[in-house]
Amino acid sequence: MKFDPQKYRELAEKDFEAAWKAGKEILAERSPNELYPRVGFSFGKEHPLFATIQRLREAYLSIGFSEVVNPLIVEDVHVKKQFGREALAVLDRCFYLATLPKPNVGISAEKIRQIEAITKREVDSKPLQEIFHRYKKGEIDGDDLSYLIAEVLDVDDITAVKILDEVFPEFKELKPISSTLTLRSHMTTGWFITLSHIADKLPLPIKLFSIDRCFRREQGEDATRLYTYFSASCVLVDEELSVDDGKAVAEALLRQFGFENFRFRKDEKRSKYYIPDTQTEVFAFHPKLVGSSTKYSDGWIEIATFGIYSPTALAEYDIPYPVMNLGLGVERLAMILYGYDDVRKMVYPQIHGEIKLSDLDIAREIKVKEVPQTAVGLKIAQSIVETAEKHASEPSPCSFLAFEGEMMGRNVRVYVVEEEENTKLCGPAYANEVVVYKGDIYGIPKTKKWRSFFEEGVPTGIRYIDGFAYYAARKVEEAAMREQEEVKVKARIVENLSDINLYIHENVRRYILWKKGKIDVRGPLFVTVKAEIE
């Protein structure tokens, strides 16, 4: 808290040691929920896919390639121009875009009567007919239709939507009609379009890259395939090119991701947009794969493909220079870098069960439920803890004064007591601490047996006696406010977090159960606090 510098300068001149020790007084007593690990600075997390995309962007830029955005929605004629006779087989893998046709909407006398029944007023059909006519011609967008109908009929939007739904069923009967537009199934489709505009205008060599989505109509999604994926693709345009240029680009790019050795093999697929015998598979060795549980446990994986575009395909776009194209799937690279064996779990962790909370994440959500609201209340809680620690093993019956002082204008005395005979002031579990270890929550003593839980897990810093003391101090505060003369608070067997005045957010509790984890805080606390208020 704020302090007076002059006071401390004068105190230091008189007695530096005393001034130094007095420094503690500027540290305010904090609520237990404002103590670490419950207090911390949160930060966002990168998605592994987009983190890999960013690294790929930097890698391409570092070897002199410039970034472009290629067309994503393309006419199917481009696939036919690039693939020739193979086009139909390729188009079978493409998603075609469909649109809803704009219906011819007629306004009959019957429909006018229906509208008047809804609006409770006479309706002029001409302005309404004009709106539907403009909508049919494409002058009005569909999302503006209900607004404009409401405007000409002088009704609210809800009534306009009701009119469309009940009076004009032709809108509900519309069926999509396919167009000739497709979603790009691979980046090559976009490269031909891009290069057709710049290949004869920029100085050679032209070095471009693009990292963007492609869409492929797979039979279904599984551990290795999704309907949409990211392609990290580049082109090199020059008068003199060979397969060796592709090898050089592949090595320069992939070495930046930890790949160490490379093998190149002719691809048996022989796509028609590549010159024969130039389509090449790139195999690379990565030490992270060695000994893994995947089929790449020897460290080698097919990671990229390159080739030189065929002049028969380039000629369709009047591109007069050879073009080397290299591409790799970002998802495959990200799976290697982040250790995934299922692309669905990596791309859609929120859907495919890979949500992860660390022990620290869980520990941060374990909080004290009832907390004293005054500085005196916090001091009472601390006094209860100190008294319990000092006299925990004293034989009963026994009583120890923990605090005496003023609260809310009243004199308060707080005792830690045990009235039953032949026991101790505190039960055996009073010093158990709540610890999060490997996703589970435990209440355990700080002994050699449990050392690994404290060292490898995340201790919350809250013992059973701490949680109970805060609760007892809060009850003393409430008693003082209500002008009660006495209050007694007892703790017995602990079964749940709530028994020691702790709680955890329901979402985190569900996460632990979903992961088949456990919350085990059972133990005998047996502590009683009694307060006298005058």
Curated annotation (Swiss-Prot):
EC numbers on record: 6.1.1.27
Family, similarity comment: Belongs to the class-II aminoacyl-tRNA synthetase family. O-phosphoseryl-tRNA(Cys) synthetase subfamily.
Q: What is this protein called?
A: O-phosphoserine--tRNA(Cys) ligase
Amino acids binding substrate: 186-188, 231-233, 273-274, 325
Q: Which HAMAP family would you find in this protein's record?
A: Sep_tRNA_synth
Q: Which domain of life is it from?
A: Archaea
SUPFAM superfamilies on file: Class II aaRS and biotin synthetases (SSF55681)
Q: How does it assemble?
A: Homotetramer. Interacts with SepCysS.
Alphabetical UniProt keywords = Aminoacyl-tRNA synthetase, ATP-binding, Ligase, Nucleotide-binding, Protein biosynthesis
Query: What organism is the protein native to?
Result: Archaeoglobus fulgidus (strain ATCC 49558 / DSM 4304 / JCM 9628 / NBRC 100126 / VC-16)
The protein's role, per its UniProt record: Catalyzes the attachment of O-phosphoserine (Sep) to tRNA(Cys).
Q: What is the effect of changing residue 418 to N?
A: Shows reduced phosphoserine ligation activity. Shows appreciable ligation activity with both suppressor tRNA(Opal) and tRNA(Amber), and reduces ligation activity with tRNA(Cys)
Give one GO biological process term: tRNA aminoacylation
* Record-linked Pfam families: SepRS_C (PF18006), tRNA-synt_2d (PF01409)
Q: Which PROSITE patterns match?
A: AA_TRNA_LIGASE_II (PS50862)
Extract one GO molecular function annotation from the record: identical protein binding
Q: What class of enzyme is it?
A: ligase
Q: What is the effect of changing residue 423 to V?
A: Shows higher activity than the E418N/E420N mutant with both suppressor tRNA(Opal) and tRNA(Amber), and the activity with tRNA(Opal) and tRNA(Amber) is almost 30% of that of the wild-type SepRS with tRNA(Cys)
Reaction catalysed by this enzyme: tRNA(Cys) + O-phospho-L-serine + ATP = O-phospho-L-seryl-tRNA(Cys) + AMP + diphosphate
